[in-house]
């Protein structure tokens, strides 16, 4: 893995897990809006590190914990995981001994996919991500709902470093067709499983609710996958700050209102 930090190590720590096809630097726009109050840690998965070999989620978790210890981090104010980063974040949450105060999943890809299907997915995902490097980001609209210039550098960097073997190994132990790992009830109460109502991953929401009945489930009405984070990193950072400091979401105009029981 490769690690970047933003902010003062003496401040409360926020750990990010990035989405598929990008590097950890993709969290920089949000982290820079948090750096005055928090110490932000941005790992890049071994999958997107040139010269490194992905050895499994347990090894990724070990590397993250080793780095946190080297920085003197003894607890985490917040874990933020985007898309497939939710898969690794969940492994981290169930294995780490570090206290974690809050968790925010942004469009978590809580898919449970059979082994044979995951094997078929590998060449398609590999070519999609490599094409972003080869085309200098021009093919982004083919794999994403947007093609914002601001996010293209993260896809290009990931595509440049990606090797087929690492993609194959990651899909071997990610998005597995297994029950979701258990989370203590108290952890669930401070965990936000957010989905945009317009994103494909929204279809996983009900399954996640059944697995984690004490979690928080905000829905961003009309929003696409990670749209708030991508289009408004300052607003997204302010939302995360509210979660850490007040244990609640701020008023958001696109937040779906909960239906009251009759």
Report each predicted region and the residues it spans.
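Conserved alpha/beta-hydrolase catalytic His-Asp/Glu region
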Residues: 114-116, 131-185
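Conserved serine/cysteine hydrolase catalytic core
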Residues: 172-210, 219, 228-229
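Conserved HGGG/HGGXW glycine-rich cap/lid loop of the alpha/beta-hydrolase fold
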Residues: 4-50
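Active-site loop/oxyanion-hole signature of alpha/beta-hydrolase fold enzymes
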Residues: 32, 41-78
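Flexible "cap/lid" loop of the alpha/beta hydrolase fold
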Residues: 94-130
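Gly/Ala-rich beta-loop-alpha elbow adjacent to hydrolase catalytic centers
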Residues: 80-89
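Catalytic histidine-centered segment of alpha/beta-hydrolase-like enzymes
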Residues: 223-235
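Alpha/beta-hydrolase fold catalytic core
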Residues: 1-15, 36-39, 157-161, 242-262
